[in-house]
A protein has these predicted regions:
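Active-site residues of response regulator receiver
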Residues: 8, 54, 81
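The feature encodes the CheY-like receiver
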Residues: 13, 53, 58
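Short hydrophobic/Thr-rich beta-strand motif most characteristic of the beta2 strand and flanking loop
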Residues: 26-34, 42, 197
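Acidic catalytic/metal-coordinating carboxylates
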Residues: 35-38, 59-64
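Short amphipathic alpha-helix used as the core "switch/output" element in two-component signaling
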Residues: 41, 63-74
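Active-site beta3 strand of CheY-like receiver
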Residues: 46-52
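Short, flexible helix-to-coil linker/hinge segments that flank and couple to helix-turn-helix
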Residues: 89-94, 99, 104-155, 159, ...
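Recognition helix of helix-turn-helix DNA-binding domains
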Residues: 167-202
Length: 217
């Protein structure tokens, strides 16, 4: 059973999400929160698999709440936003969010998003990814700390990181290199450990911030 906390300051959205997710036999909404601070408390108390986190909330905004949830728990955060141009997108990924979902997404997409993020995968819609890459391009120069961390990877781990940033799954990376999927999982696990990553969304950020992958190429 996947355990979910809903964090949104609008009652209507929380009720709608709760109804949709509650209809799934493998998903349980264990708590709701009307602001970021309450979301952090709920995550610490209930230890959910996923926190659906609205980005614009009172008391503590979604970015700050995401940072605290990721630091204090093993829960994964799926950020919610009304617009794919939201200025919070980049900051939330930096804070540890595993992906983004637009609030007007079809109900099937909401259910799938929860399952994908709970499984440890990233959920980055093309429009959202483009926005984040655009922000990285605007920043211009690679992050020296990220460069140093990526330099410490083996050649194979570096290549796997590059392919993760390109959106390939473990199975696709295995086929690309004629490796077993188990071997690829080992490489992914090793590079996650070395780079202190929680999931593939963070791996994508590191690949771009280190200059391993260049926006636009």
């Amino acid at each position: 059973m996947l355990r979910v906390v809903l964090a949104d300051d609008q009652d209507l959205f929380r009720a709608g999400f709760a109804t949709i997710l509650g209809a799934e036999p493998d998903i349980e909404v264990v708590a709701e929160a009307p602001d970021g601070a309450a979301a952090v408390r709920a995550a610490r108390e209930h230890r959910p698999d996923v926190v659906l986190m609205d980005m614009r909330m009172p008391v503590l905004d979604g970015v700050a709440a995401t940072r605290q949830v990721c630091a204090l728990t093993t829960s994964r955060v799926l950020a919610l936003t009304m617009f794919d141009t939201d200025d919070y997108l980049y900051a939330a990924l930096r804070a540890g969010a595993s992906g983004f979902l637009l609030k007007d997404a079809p109900r099937a997409d909401l259910v799938n998003a929860v399952r994908v993020v709970a499984a440890g995968d990233a959920l980055l819609a093309p429009a959202v990814t483009a926005r984040v890459i655009g922000e990285l391009h605007r920043r211009g120069h690679p992050d020296p700390a990220r460069v140093a961390a990526v330099t410490a990877l083996t050649a194979r781990e570096t290549d796997v990181l590059r392919l993760i940033a390109a959106g390939l799954s473990n199975a696709e990376i295995a086929a690309h290199h004629h490796l077993s999927e188990h071997t690829v999982k080992t490489h992914v696990g090793n590079l996650f450990t070395k780079l202190h990553l929680r999931d593939r969304a963070q791996a994508v950020m590191v690949a771009y911030e280190s200059g391993l992958v260049i926006p636009g190429q």
